[in-house]
């Protein structure tokens, strides 16, 4: 299935143009404008030296050869060539260094802004975008802007100045012949405009396919166990091959479109050169030009072709850069999640109320949650039960404001959550997700995630989570690296490490989505004991899957189709004989089996 890239958006109402991209980049360039001007000046020196080479040929050929040649011309011309090469080399090095300094500074700032904006976007962003799209934007696509800032700018500035200097010298040598050379320029401009539009469309589609190819790799790596157990290697290989072939097709179409410009440009230049030679021969017969003047003119004309070719070739990377800019600034312009009303919350009592809360994702036929109302007293444990798709996860996601309700209000300590500063609100909550998330860092850093690790507190949290002995047996103890998402730990150890992280935070409100994965009896016992310690004295909302957790809850809310259909203690709901009793009976039979 193809993914739709919603990050890439035109940067103005009519599309993306180089001027639009430059306007967006200007705030990043402005603090470095002095260095940019210096780089442009050094590129101007490089361009001027290009015209100096044919300028030295004319006196050498006219006055340096033969028995009547000038002695001074025989010596000053070679020395001037050496001096010219030295000036050119120093200027070229300086311009490259200065431009790379500027572009890398801007690259760093763009990348930091993109990552910061990603961190502060709402949960809907992460549901909408694939990880591969975001990774490509932050890590890879931003380098296209680097290419534009260096290679493209060098071409546009240095080669444009080179063409101007050479055309000026050509006009000085022979204005009639120069007018013939100038005839090819409109033809080249017409070619560029025709190829430009097609290249931009192909680049946009090529980058979309690249993201989809990355997504296939991401899915295959993340689900390698399923792939292997279900013998899905052939299916994944076919999927990857088909997408790679489509990507190759677009790459070749880009090559065909981009490659037409150079030979057509050279053909037009060859026609102009043939006409110039013909006219120059006629002029020489009438003593209107010299050998040195003719050679200098032809040399200058040939030297013009190379920078012109570079200016034509710059179109392809320029289009790639503009397409990348749409993705980069699409992420930077992504709206940040609301930060709340700014009200502080130093220490919550743990008093929670859902008041006629309705929520829908926009595309569903019915609300995901429909007029949900309940209260949770400080220290009370509420278990959420119900069939899959009943709205349990959505309900707990509203409390830390991953999403805001469509209607109704959620209150903490009698105050709507929207009135609190968002960071202050979330600082009062700990979450243990069903899908355990660990970071490729040490055990201590994972336990104290978001804070500077206090090793004594980390050790206490590990002991409370029944993980201290296992960590002590590891070679590096608290400094043991857990690997990507804790791959070096067992399933039970990963769950207990996530519990230790919640214990370390010591927040008064706990959101717990119990893992459904089965563990061996010993690991299950350790995890259950750790959960009981974690929930002590905390207001707890738990999506319960274990019978033992459900049974010890102070109150159970049973959801179905986004509504609370039953409420009460375990014994009360069993006696009622409704949906909860039915679900309990099924789960009990499964566990007994």
Curated annotation (Swiss-Prot):
Main location: membrane
Keywords, comma-separated and alphabetical: ATP-binding, Cell inner membrane, Cell membrane, Lipid transport, Membrane, Nucleotide-binding, Translocase, Transmembrane, Transmembrane helix, Transport
Membrane topology note: Multi-pass membrane protein
GO MF terms held by the record: ABC-type oligopeptide transporter activity; ATP binding; ATP hydrolysis activity; ATPase-coupled lipid transmembrane transporter activity
An annotated GO cellular component: plasma membrane
Positions of disulphide bridges: none
Residue intervals passing through the bilayer: 33-53, 75-95, 137-157, 164-184, 262-282, 292-312
Subunit structure: Homodimer.
Record note on domains: In MsbA the ATP-binding domain (NBD) and the transmembrane domain (TMD) are fused.
Protein name, entry field: ATP-dependent lipid A-core flippase
Protein's gene: msbA
